[in-house]
Amino acid sequence: VSCNSTVNICALDLSKAFDKMNHYGLFIKLMDRQIPVQLLQLLEFWFRSGLTCVKWGDCFSAFYSQARGIRQGGVLSPYLFALYIDSVIEKVRRSRVGCEIKLESVGIIVYADDILLVAPTVTALQLLLKMCENELNWLAMSINASKSACLRIGKDYKTVSVCIRTIDGREIPWQDNVRYLGMHLVANNVFTCSFDNAKKSYYRAFNAIYSKIGGIASEEVILEMLKMKCLPVLLYGTDVCPVNKKQLKSLEYVLTSSLMKIFRTQSGDVVDDCMKFFWFV
């Protein structure tokens, strides 16, 4: 982008990724990495011993075992899933089709089941998608095209003449805003993030707390709740995403409006004095 180029991004959504992970496919990948036999047998025993059932109203079905799927909240689940789809990452890196930074391939960025493809051209992005989809099909996984999206960043971000499609012909739309790992990337001539959704979530969190304790709790308690429950929502991602002066002023206004409500004032100077008094800096 800094060299007047345009970067093409595709955020892929995998359909029920953790639920579709094949146990035997995972065991093969673990054996390829030559993990200890005892550990492999332990994992196999865990998966074989796991039982599930279906509840409908007050009725329960018979328990049955599953040949695929892992718990999304499990401690080991993210690591096992990362190992399971590692072949997708390696295939893209070896192709050298995507973008590179100092000769290091960054054509694919993966965190758990959130996949981001990055390419210098639309044609290259289509090739990356085809490579990923072929490998994912081999892993018995599929892409949810309706929840996936493409985005362009750079001088030609408004110019898009070619649609990105999956192997079976489903179109992945070009959008002005793409959500990845909780952050909203915006189509622009420079790398930009939107904090509009963060501000909405902050207001929801603050109003939920203030409506419960605003009339009975002290300012110290409300401010502590604001620090713990609301500020992390508002400031999520600001340490890694670029924040311009306009966005910074907008975030400051959101916080100031909440503090005005807590201290029951419309004066910014009073809010500043109260923040210093309560060490809220």
Predicted regions located by residue number:
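Conserved, non-catalytic sequence blocks in retroelement Pol enzymes and Pol-derived host proteins
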Residues: 1-4, 14-20, 32-38, 69-79, ...
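Short, conserved micro-motifs composed of acidic
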Residues: 58, 142-177
